[in-house]
């Protein structure tokens, strides 16, 4: 891990561009639940029938004993794996605390384990998120950063988009002086199919505010994330 993190170097002043949030990260969209309660969806029976069709497509006998309950189980698993579509990121960060005794440094929660699903192949990718923010007077409960990560992870994702969404949500709701997010993950769509490279890790990062503008703060964040392994 050390060698890979060292390759994520703090940006030089000449490299930095004016900060802008990608168009797809409109706060009105990514801070609300992705699926509205009144949004039409296929019935559960239709979802189970679709699973049965896929089983038939790969050549399975859908009537054999071991597969009779598989469509139901798969749909139930989807309800769990993709529950983030029905959860609101803004609500997770809504409650803050002002009793900080004048604390003026950044807050870092590292090694937040997560599992998500690649939107290209619908195969899992999993790893750890490291999140820091520098509060302005008020802080959020530490567990909320883990909950926020899970909400976005329990949707179809790319690692790049997941990283950007976490940072943008904290930036938009908490209005901190800066946010830093680093995600390291292994993608099964790369390890068990295609090139089949087991153990290959992907690192993505997103810096805003003081972390984006101050290479020393980026370096300090990366040093603390690297820590003792």
Swiss-Prot record:
Annotated pathway: Cofactor biosynthesis; 7,8-dihydroneopterin triphosphate biosynthesis; 7,8-dihydroneopterin triphosphate from GTP: step 1/1
Start and end residues of each stretch annotated as Disordered: 1-25
Extent of Basic and acidic residues compositional bias: 12-24
Gene Ontology terms describing biological process: one-carbon metabolic process; tetrahydrobiopterin biosynthetic process; tetrahydrofolate biosynthetic process
Species this protein is from: Bradyrhizobium diazoefficiens (strain JCM 10833 / BCRC 13528 / IAM 13628 / NBRC 14792 / USDA 110)
Record has Manganese as a keyword: no
Protein's name according to its UniProt entry: GTP cyclohydrolase 1
Keywords: GTP-binding, Hydrolase, Metal-binding, Nucleotide-binding, One-carbon metabolism, Zinc
Family: Belongs to the GTP cyclohydrolase I family.
Domain of life of the source: Bacteria
Enzyme type, top EC level: hydrolase
Self-association state and partner proteins as the record states: Toroid-shaped homodecamer, composed of two pentamers of five dimers.
Record EC number: 3.5.4.16
Record's GO cellular component terms: cytoplasm
Catalytic activity reported: GTP + H2O = 7,8-dihydroneopterin 3'-triphosphate + formate + H(+)
Residues binding Zn(2+): 118, 121, 189
InterPro entries xrefs: GTP-CH-I_C/QueF, GTP-CH-I_N, GTP_CycHdrlase_I, GTP_CycHdrlase_I_CS, GTP_CycHdrlase_I_dom
HAMAP family registered for this protein in UniProt: FolE (MF_00223)
GO molecular function: GTP binding; GTP cyclohydrolase I activity; zinc ion binding
């Amino acid at each position: 891990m050390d060698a890979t993190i060292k390759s994520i170097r703090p940006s030089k002043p000449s490299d930095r561009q004016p900060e802008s949030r990608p168009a797809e990260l409109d706060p009105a969209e990514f801070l609300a639940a992705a699926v509205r309660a009144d949004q039409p969806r296929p019935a559960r029976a239709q979802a189970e029938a679709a699973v049965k069709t896929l089983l038939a497509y790969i050549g399975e006998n859908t009537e054999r004993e071991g597969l009779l309950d598989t469509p139901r189980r798969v749909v139930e698993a989807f309800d769990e794996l993709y529950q983030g579509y029905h959860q609101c990121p803004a609500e997770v960060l809504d409650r803050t605390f002002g009793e900080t005794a004048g604390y003026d440094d950044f807050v870092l929660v590292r090694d937040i384990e997560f599992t998500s699903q690649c939107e290209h192949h619908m195969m899992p990718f999993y790893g750890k998120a490291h999140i820091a923010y520098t509060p302005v007077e008020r802080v959020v409960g530490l567990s909320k950063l883990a909950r926020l990560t899970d909400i976005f992870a329990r949707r179809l994702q790319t690692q790049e988009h997941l990283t950007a969404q976490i940072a943008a949500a904290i930036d938009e709701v908490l209005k901190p002086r800066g946010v830093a997010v680093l995600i390291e993950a292994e993608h099964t769509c790369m390890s068990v199919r295609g090139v089949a490279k087991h153990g290959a890790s992907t690192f993505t990062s997103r810096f805003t505010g003081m972390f984006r503008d101050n290479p020393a703060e980026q370096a300090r964040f990366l040093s603390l994330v690297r820590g003792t392994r």
